[in-house]
Curated annotation (Swiss-Prot):
Its EC number is 2.1.1.-. It comes from Burkholderia vietnamiensis (strain G4 / LMG 22486). NCBIfam families: prmA. One of its GO terms (cellular component) is cytosol. HAMAP family: Methyltr_PrmA (MF_00735). It is an enzyme of class 2 (transferase). Signal peptide: none annotated. One of its GO terms (biological process) is methylation. It catalyses: L-lysyl-[protein] + 3 S-adenosyl-L-methionine = N(6),N(6),N(6)-trimethyl-L-lysyl-[protein] + 3 S-adenosyl-L-homocysteine + 3 H(+). It is found in: Cytoplasm. S-adenosyl-L-methionine binds at T152, G173, D195, N234. Keywords: Cytoplasm, Methyltransferase, S-adenosyl-L-methionine, Transferase. This is Ribosomal protein L11 methyltransferase.
Amino acid sequence: MSYRELVVELAREHAEALSDALLDLGALSVSVEDADADTPDEQPLFGEPGLVPERTAWQHSRVVALLSPDLEPAVLLAAAANEIGIADTPKFDVREVEEQDWVRLTQSQFEPIPIGERIWVVPSWHDAPDPDALILELDPGLAFGTGSHPTTRLCMEWLEQTVKPGQSVLDYGCGSGILAILARKCGADPVIGIDIDPQAVESARQNSERNHADVTYGLPDACPDGEFDIVVANILSNPLKLMASMLASKVKPGGRIALSGVLARQADEVAAVYARYVDISVWREHEGWVCLAGTRRESH
């Protein structure tokens, strides 16, 4: 089967949020274009070099998302629209894309990514820019998480600053396994990665083997009993709220928890749900997304 492009035209105020939601829900890549390009209504977004742009998207924007063959465009778009508060699913088109085009596009667009103080995420077709750094070798794939998205970056920066050797870590919603692998490379042991998607679990296992990281992965029913020193969950705000009691119960008293996949405007609502269990606040914000971090109280 061929890869597909989902093409949606919508107003500027929804374009960026929809792009982020599509990525969170499994799109391989997303771009925002001027829907009026090459017409009399075309609007330059950026002005003179060195000047800060007045806008970050066009008034009439086109969102183009690349989808793997197993994703149903209509279902994905409806879920993304619901996530950002659009009641009616926008009109859309679907275009077929040859698989070999995607492979070439991947290798031309993905470069090594520096994160935090000493982390590099490096595709397999690149050499590590700094062999002495903390290197994670990951290729873009069907499972979310290559370090390029703000939520992944935020969680990685938090883990780099938080994990101490020998601590136990639970990565709930592990996707590609990038956070679990990083935790293990920072000295955490044991590290458990959980995801609802069997394909993500298999991808995470393969990525851990490639990175020589001893991490145990499984579906939610395989999540071990007991508590962890650190719990990290980079998913979406609604699932985070629904799973608050369960996730908080996985943190040892005095242990740490980090939550992302949360837009800045959703932070207070998510924090309010978790405040029943943990002392939590916004740790850091990046490009409109936040990482919430907190400590479980000794009793609740």
